[in-house]
């Protein structure tokens, strides 16, 4: 499942090469919140220069950033995924894939900080660095299919965007046609098996449609 295009990856690597990019200006606030959650493991999703991990030496903290060599490998699941100043940079057509990735990695909590205004930084192709500029309400709607929003602090009027603490929703997928145990070697007919597959695929598609 693609989460970034090759051309945009090159643009982001160029931005990351700048000294002032990826400093983690919200890292201290995020670290304070993480300490209140009663967790052991932390994933900094889009870690930039790695300021958050330095602030949380008492936690098992993994760093992931697809634009930084050595930190671009597939991360492990963690009790809390922190994603600060990242989602506004995602290519709009791939936002759903990124949200699904975060959902799959979070055991208990997701802590998000999202800018809701344009960036002062400009990429090499002339675009400002925030590809998605939307309100807090828009982001809440985008997240609702995968996450339960525990708290939301909209600080857009202060130029600080929105901070949200979420829990990943848990879905139970049940087969449409019950699988009946029989004594014959063929416990499930081809028709029943196909019906189950179609039903499960339809349910998953409906659950995740809001993130497409």
Predicted features and spans:
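Conserved N-terminal segment of class I S-adenosyl-L-methionine
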Residues: 1-80, 96-100, 105, 116, ...
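A short beta-strand submotif of the Rossmann-like class I SAM-dependent methyltransferase core
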Residues: 80-86
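A short His-aromatic
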Residues: 89-90
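Acidic donor-binding/catalytic loop of UDP-sugar-dependent glycosyltransferases
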Residues: 93
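Short glycine-centered segments of the SAM/dcSAM-binding site in methyltransferase folds
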Residues: 108-111
